[in-house]
Each structure stands twice: as C-alpha cells, then as structure tokens.
C-alpha cells in the first residue's frame, strides 16, 4: 500500500461566521502542509427544535440573542461555500464538510463536495447516513461517544 497519510485541518466553526477569517484559516492550514481543510455545515432550523432555536443565549461569546440566531450567524450561504471551494482550489488544498442534516448534505453534494464526514452525534441518524451513502463518495464517520451497538 503506497497511500500517503492525509492531514486534515479542522476549522469547524472557528471562523465565527467571518468569511475573511475562514479564508485566512484555510491559507494558514495550507501553509502548514495539510491536504484538507474541514468545516461544518448545518441548517439550524432543521437541527434544532423550536424550543432550542428560540432559547435565550446570553453569553459574551454569542452571535445572536437566541441559540438559533447564534447558530445561524455561524453559517455561510451556499454561494459563500462555493466561493470558498474555489479559493481552496486556488491555494491547492481540498475542502470537505461535516454535515449535520439532510438539507446540508444535499447542498454540499450539489456543490461538488468529494468527501463527507459524519460527526459522532449523528452516527445513529440513519436517514443522514443513507443519504450521504447514496452520493457514492468517501465518508468519514466519527464514533466517539458511540456504543458498539450504535456503530
């Protein structure tokens, strides 16, 4: 086996919803020699219950008055993700996403994402797993916090 180990820079939502910061983080990761940068895509109104979405989020680190607003402000639009994908190509690094819901998975697949990650909290979300499997692309599945039965 001659496959090289792939190094992934986990950006997640550390960009804080700031497009230019995301680009800076991608470039910094590339300069460190990574093969991939990974972020996260979710639709807060899909992932959260109405109660969770509307819960007051009173924190010095909050990006909104409610938890849902906070999460919305950490998300980029599809157009922004497409621009970030082009930027990744320009700096010669690959980009992929952890997806948390079917809507996000579909959007990222239509955008041409070549690899997907399913986070530990979604390992039992069979509808999401089936959907991402249907894309016929590589999938990384985290299993932290999962029992052997869940996996």
Each predicted region: which residue ranges?
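Active-site beta->alpha loop and helix N-cap motifs at the rims of alpha/beta catalytic domains
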Residues: 59-126, 134, 148
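Hydrophobic faces of well-ordered beta-strands that scaffold small-molecule active sites
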Residues: 7-11, 37-39, 95-98, 114-118, ...
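Active-site beta-loop-alpha junctions enriched in small/polar residues
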Residues: 12-14, 40-44, 100-102, 121, ...
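Glycine-rich, proline-tolerant flexible connector loops at the mouths of alpha/beta enzymes
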Residues: 35-75
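Conserved, mostly hydrophobic/aromatic
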Residues: 10, 29, 108, 142
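Conserved anion-binding
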Residues: 44, 124-151
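N-terminal small/glycine-rich loop or linker at the start of catalytic domains
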Residues: 1-16, 56, 63-67, 82-83
């Amino acid at each position: 086996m001659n496959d090289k180990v792939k190094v992934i820079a986990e950006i997640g939502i550390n960009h804080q919803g700031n497009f230019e910061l995301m680009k800076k983080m991608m470039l910094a990761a590339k300069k460190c020699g990574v093969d991939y940068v990974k972020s996260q895509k979710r639709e807060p109104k899909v992932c959260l219950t109405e109660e969770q979405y509307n819960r007051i989020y009173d924190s010095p680190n909050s990006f909104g008055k409610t938890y849902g607003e906070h999460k919305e402000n950490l998300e980029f639009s599809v157009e922004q993700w497409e621009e970030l994908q082009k930027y990744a190509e320009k700096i010669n690094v690959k980009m992929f996403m952890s997806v948390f819901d079917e809507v996000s998975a579909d959007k990222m697949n239509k955008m041409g994402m070549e690899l997907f990650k399913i986070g530990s909290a979604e390992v039992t979300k069979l509808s999401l797993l089936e959907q991402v499997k249907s894309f016929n692309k590589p999938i990384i599945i985290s299993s932290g916090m999962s029992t052997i039965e869940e996996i």
